[in-house]
């Protein structure tokens, strides 16, 4: 942009009175001085930390805090991740143990196929589960126990859900049914003796009308303590397992599916004593977490202050430009004052502070929100590491990735919106048509995962081969469906997506060689030829520059 002419106009309205008074009482030399001051202020604002140090001796505190925070947050996440891994492993191993303990003849990886097909097998499974529950202390190798309710132990609830009335005669193609569902429950106490006999003489006195039966549920509660955390210098947690064994006969197809669901809750143990230095280690970890919170608070304050300073300078520049050149600053130029990296760091700091507080509460056994804490700490750590890219971006050779992503993002979003319409169309079509015949298309979520893996070229043959050939028309449709999807997304849409990124990359490389297009803001700043170490950016109360804090580029 060439040097803009200073426009002096008459006062035509009350709202321009201040501007007119300024233009009428300000000499050209004073206006040039104000322009130079504004240029220096803007140039200083857009300098990198090293240049700001040479310009005013300002220490790069935010950079130092970010480097310190990366190390501390990463260490914190690793330590919590190891602890959370033990919790998840304990949950999964107990669930597998319960399936082997209470499901007769259960074998690993039978969750989708575990079922019974005769009435006697149903009774046998129920009796086996009840007997295993009553003999828990004699058969379980874990530290499992019944839930205590005062002086009594919790009972197992056996409930059957069935239609209120049902007379079904498939041979005559007739039926009479009342779809209202009724529930009948009774309880088995752990201290009661139990006799295993034939279905006709078993102690349960359970009779099932399989024509009306929908489900049979066996629900009971067990407790356990995760002692493996002691070896890692952590206090153990107490676990409550709410187990539900379901016999599903809703389809009335002759196949009753059996499943075991385990609802797990973690809580603080009531009375405990551990010898050794576990409590001391817990206190040290809480001190470390408190130091992480303090560091993030400092980072949060510094970044918020920088964002506010940017917004204030933005408003000052907009008013200055409107006052001197009677022009509005473009939105793109105004957005350059809003530093997205600082906003990302602010979000990261907030997540880290909340996650660290939760972690301290978990260590103090006041909370057991492991999953929420892991999500907060994991997301914050990811954002912290991404925030470092800002400082790498000050070097031209490392800035190519950032510039390419920034330039390509608008086009990528528009392209993905169009591609998503096609993708969702294929998802719904595959779910409805192929779902009954293909395991990978049974739910909308599974369809999306299957199609996305096909785009990456994964598991193509298995997807074709697992299609059932019970219906030739559907089998033929599946071939047309899969071939068209693969051809469209891999050879066309994915290629166009890569070409979009590649074209942006080449454009950025060309700009780096020949110069980037100048905006009004950058052109205005470029007229300031003062170097950072010229001394013209320094304020009266600035301390002298020390050569030991930063190296001149």
Swiss-Prot record:
Keyword S-adenosyl-L-methionine: no
Cystine bridges: 159-185, 238-269
Pfam families xref list: MCLN_ECD (PF21381), PKD_channel (PF08016)
A cellular-component GO term for this protein: lysosomal membrane
Membrane topology: Multi-pass membrane protein
Site location (Interaction with phosphoinositides): 305
Region (Extracellular/lumenal pore loop): 104-118
Interaction with phosphoinositides as annotated region, ranges: 52-62
Membrane-traversing stretches: 63-83, 284-304, 342-362, 372-392, 415-435, 476-497
Subcellular location: Lysosome membrane; Early endosome membrane; Late endosome membrane; Cytoplasmic vesicle, Autophagosome membrane
Intramembrane residue numbers: 444-464
Membrane found in the keyword field: yes
Post-translational events: N-glycosylated.
BP GO annotations: monoatomic cation transmembrane transport; protein homotetramerization
Residues carrying covalently attached carbohydrate according to the record: 138, 205
Entry function: Nonselective cation channel probably playing a role in the regulation of membrane trafficking events. Acts as a Ca(2+)-permeable cation channel with inwardly rectifying activity. Mediates release of Ca(2+) from endosomes to the cytoplasm, contributes to endosomal acidification and is involved in the regulation of membrane trafficking and fusion in the endosomal pathway. Also permeable to Mg(2+), Na(+) and K(+). Does not seem to act as mechanosensory transduction channel in inner ear sensory hair cells.
Protein name (Swiss-Prot/TrEMBL): Mucolipin-3
Name of encoding gene: MCOLN3
């Amino acid at each position: 942009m060439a040097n803009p002419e200073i426009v002096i106009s008459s006062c035509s309205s009350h709202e321009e009175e201040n501007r007119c008074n300024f233009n009428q009482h300000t000499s050209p030399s004073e206006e040039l001085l104000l322009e130079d001051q504004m240029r220096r202020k803007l140039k200083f604002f857009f300098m990198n930390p090293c240049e700001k140090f040479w310009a005013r001796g300002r220490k790069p505190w935010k950079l130092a805090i970010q480097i310190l925070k990366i190390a501390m947050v990463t260490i914190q996440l690793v330590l919590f991740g190891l602890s959370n891994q033990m919790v998840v492993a304990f949950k999964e191993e107990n669930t597998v143990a319960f399936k082997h303990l209470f499901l007769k003849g259960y074998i690993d990886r039978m969750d989708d196929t575990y079922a019974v097909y005769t009435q006697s097998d149903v009774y046998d499974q129920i009796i086996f589960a009840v007997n295993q529950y009553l003999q828990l202390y004699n058969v379980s190798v874990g530290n499992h126990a019944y839930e205590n309710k005062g002086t009594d132990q919790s009972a197992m609830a056996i409930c059957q859900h069935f239609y209120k009335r049902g007379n079904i005669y498939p041979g005559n193609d007739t039926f009479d049914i009342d779809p209202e569902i009724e529930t009948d429950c009774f309880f088995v106490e752990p201290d009661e003796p139990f006799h295993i006999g034939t279905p006709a003489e078993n102690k349960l006195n359970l009779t099932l009308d399989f024509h009306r039966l929908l489900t049979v549920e066996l629900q009971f509660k067990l407790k356990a303590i995760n002692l493996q955390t002691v070896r890692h210098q952590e206090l153990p947690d107490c676990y409550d397992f709410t187990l539900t064994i379901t016999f599903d006969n809703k389809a009335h197809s002759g196949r009753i599916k059996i499943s075991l669901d385990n609802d797990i809750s973690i809580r603080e143990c009531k009375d405990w004593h551990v010898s050794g230095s576990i409590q001391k280690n817990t206190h040290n970890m809480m001190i470390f977490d408190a130091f992480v919170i303090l560091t993030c608070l400092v980072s949060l304050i510094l970044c918020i202050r920088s964002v506010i300073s940017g917004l204030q300078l933005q408003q000052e520049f907009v008013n200055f430009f409107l006052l001197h050149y009677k022009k509005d600053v473009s939105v793109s130029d105004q957005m350059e004052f809003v530093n997205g990296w600082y906003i990302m760091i602010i979000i990261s700091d907030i997540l880290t502070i909340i996650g660290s507080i939760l972690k301290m509460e978990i260590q103090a056994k006041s909370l057991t929100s492991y999953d929420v804490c892991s999500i907060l700490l994991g997301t914050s750590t990811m954002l912290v590491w991404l925030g470092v890219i800002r400082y790498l971006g000050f070097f031209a050779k490392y800035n190519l990735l950032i510039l390419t992503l920034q330039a390509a993002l608008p086009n990528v979003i528009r392209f993905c919106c169009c591609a998503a319409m096609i993708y969702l169309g294929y998802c719904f079509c595959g779910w409805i048509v192929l779902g009954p015949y293909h395991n990978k298309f049974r739910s909308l979520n599974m369809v999306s995962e299957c199609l996305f893996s096909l785009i990456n070229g994964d598991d193509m043959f298995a997807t074709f081969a697992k299609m059932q050939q019970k219906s030739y028309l559907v089998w033929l449709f599946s071939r047309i469906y899969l071939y068209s999807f693969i051809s469209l997304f891999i050879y066309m849409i994915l290629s166009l997506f890569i070409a979009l990124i590649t074209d942006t990359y080449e454009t950025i490389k060309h700009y780096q060689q020949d110069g980037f297009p100048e905006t009004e803001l950058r052109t205005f700043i470029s007229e300031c030829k003062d170097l950072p170490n010229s001394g013209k950016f320094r304020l009266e109360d600035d301390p002298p520059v020390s050569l030991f804090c930063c190296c001149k580029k």
